[in-house]
């Protein structure tokens, strides 16, 4: 997606064919949390970007092509650290663990815990009922609805995790709380759109309504 008007965002662009790593490093030196993956594509430059992010040991949320790039590179898997949370759907989890989707779908908790055990990272495994695993605990999220199975919904979840960490919520707590907020926001969106017409932007609007009601 080409950048559109978003006045509240500070943007630093890059040329995928002539990427300047120093530009990324400059951002990593001041940021509190990193969300990487949605829309970046796969390839050597993207893998180098992910490697550089992991070197800074920052709280990091990895989704979509971030997970796909790591799945292709055992070297990157070895650089994962305890401040990382991945947010895969079943297909991404299948590639990450090199395990059939059907096997993962029938053993969500088992494979969520396997990610934590093997790589010492948190995992939000997205399905009809999302399974969240941290170092010591496992949670099943019950909020949300089938209308949220729409393009960009997972990207919204990635943003919620990163936003919670950015405002000071402890890393494990943010991992657990974000899917619940995401689901509740989707349920709020159901008050003014149907399941069949729900878009990711509706979920974002649901977040605004949800937080206003909490004040």
Locate each region found by the language model.
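Short, small-residue alpha-helix embedded
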Residues: 95-96, 150-181
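Gly/Ser/Thr-rich beta-alpha loop segments that engage phosphate groups in nucleotides
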Residues: 39-43, 146, 154-157, 161, ...
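Charged C-terminal helix
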Residues: 5, 186-215
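N-terminal loops that bind phosphate or other acidic moieties
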Residues: 52, 169, 193
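Short, well-structured alpha-helical segments that form the helix of a local strand-helix-strand
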Residues: 108-117, 171-186, 200-208
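Glycine-rich phosphate/dinucleotide-binding loop and adjoining beta-alpha-beta core of small-molecule
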Residues: 1-143, 215
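Short pre-catalytic strand/loop immediately N-terminal to key active-site residues, enriched for Gly-Thr
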Residues: 140-152
């Amino acid at each position: 997606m080409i950048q559109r008007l978003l006045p509240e965002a500070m943007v630093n662009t890059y040329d995928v064919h002539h990427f300047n790593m120093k530009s990324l490093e400059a951002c990593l030196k001041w940021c509190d949390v990193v969300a990487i993956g949605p829309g970046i594509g796969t390839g050597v430059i993207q893998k180098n970007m992910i490697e550089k992010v992991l070197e800074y040991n920052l709280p990091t949320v990895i989704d979509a092509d971030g997970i796909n790039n790591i799945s292709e590179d055992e070297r990157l898997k070895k650089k994962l650290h305890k401040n990382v949370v991945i947010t895969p759907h079943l297909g991404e989890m299948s590639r990450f663990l090199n395990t059939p989707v059907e096997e993962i779908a029938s053993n969500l908790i088992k494979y969520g815990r396997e990610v934590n055990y093997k790589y010492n990272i948190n995992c939000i495994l997205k399905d009809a009922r999302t399974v969240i695993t941290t170092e010591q605990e496992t949670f099943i999220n019950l909020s949300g609805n089938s209308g949220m199975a729409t393009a960009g919904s997972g990207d919204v979840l990635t943003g919620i995790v990163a936003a919670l960490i950015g405002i000071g919520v402890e890393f494990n707590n943010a991992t657990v709380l974000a899917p619940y907020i995401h689901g509740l926001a989707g349920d709020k969106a159901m008050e003014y759109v149907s399941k069949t017409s729900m878009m990711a932007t509706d979920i974002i609007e649901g977040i605004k309504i949800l937080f206003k009601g909490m004040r």
